[in-house]
């Protein structure tokens, strides 16, 4: 604020140094992806929705070489939207292992850095301390229209309540595509007055329960307790009719689904506080959380008719645990052991 450099680069300022970062070779990237794939199988994951900028080329090579054994939905970075349109890419294009998702856009920053875009100032902040809007409404609307006209859905990062409201309004009013729905990533602060609008919007709420285990102290500090009533509002949004698709935001947090299930049900921090849970009216049951990790992502990927459920004719993507997650104490969810992971009828991990 005083015009002195702090050494911290917020949001778009990171572009000042991005071009100077060392570039990994194709072999290094493949090695890392194969390690990550094995770890995902060990944890009981059969698919991922990827937002990595270079992911499409790397996953394509793995698929062509027959080594990709995760169902991958790959988003298109906004700077590459025109290239994707020119190349004829559409949401839903692809094959057995790799498919095209939506165009990824960012409308704000994050909670911890106080750059998430807010309706009202942060706690203890000045009148203008409302975070950062990284995509102006008209520009945002134009990108969504342009993508939809080309058959590409939108996948939009929105954390603060102002960003979430804008995303609901713009995406909810956009052309709906047959391939897959538009989705809001994170939806971390969605106040009660937005719940019904979110439910009517037809949008997917792509949320990461594990974040709340880290964010509880930050939310209380930066948003205040009462405003935090709308934080990670899983149950109210589901009741309103919004389809929830749970994930992890790895590598920001662990991709271990057990931790996400636990967080969605118990709503406590890593230190176990508050013992009674944080805004428990927003908690979901273990069954609701499990559906949000299975049926939700399948719906978000435009594949509710062939993935996300154990039914005849569906892809044989399944996981076996040593205990029933629907018949154990919430605290036991973190200790479950994945004893088998199957993708496409092939056992890819057995404990």
Task: Identify the role of each PLM range.
Residues 61, 83-87, 111-118, 167, ...:
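Short acidic, glycine/serine/threonine-rich loops at helix termini
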Residues 144-155, 162-182, 186-187, 192-196, ...:
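His/Asp/Glu-enriched, well-ordered alpha-helical/loop segment
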Residues 1-86, 101, 105, 110-163, ...:
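Divalent metal-binding segments
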Residues 325-332:
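Short, Lys/Arg- and Gly-enriched loop/turn segments at beta-strand edges
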Residues 63-66, 88-98, 177, 198-202:
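Acidic (Asp/Glu)-rich catalytic clusters
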